[in-house]
Amino acid sequence: MFDSIEIAELQAKVRIRVIDDDEDFLKSLGLLLEMTGWTVRTYKSAKEFLSDENFSTPGCILLDLRMPEMTGLELQRNLITQNKNNLPIIFLTGHGDVDSAVYTLKNGAFDFLQKPTNPLLLNKVIAEASQKSLSTQPKNSQRK
């Protein structure tokens, strides 16, 4: 578990990427995370994320499972194929089932959470995933 000083130091070094096609949820979650101290970038689709993200800042991805055009599973596979899987993925979905959870975790997802989720649990999982990302990044690529 992290204490408040460790969380604040971690938050200063990472970015949380949130990808969800539900714009109201996206705005609400982005605001919640920012209010708790995280730097957040939101994306309405996997394609928007792929075209905009540079993957150099450590952190993690909060990813919806079901989205039009490209699902969360397809994005996960795409990132693995392109060798851009350096950011831990936390699936956050209202459409989860055991098979989907097992599949995503076997393919490298950091965690699989159901919507709605407890904000304290979400913050803990984000901190753990971000710490993992930070510990695997070269020192010169960490955000200041």
Predicted regions and their residues:
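Acidic catalytic/metal-coordinating carboxylates
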Residues: 44-45, 71-75
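Two-component/phosphorelay signaling modules centered on CheY-like receiver
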Residues: 5, 23-41
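Short amphipathic alpha-helix used as the core "switch/output" element in two-component signaling
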Residues: 73-85, 103
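C-terminal output helix
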Residues: 97, 113-126
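Non-catalytic signal-transmission and effector/linker regions of two-component phosphorelay proteins
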Residues: 1-17, 30
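Active-site residues of response regulator receiver
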Residues: 20, 63-64, 93
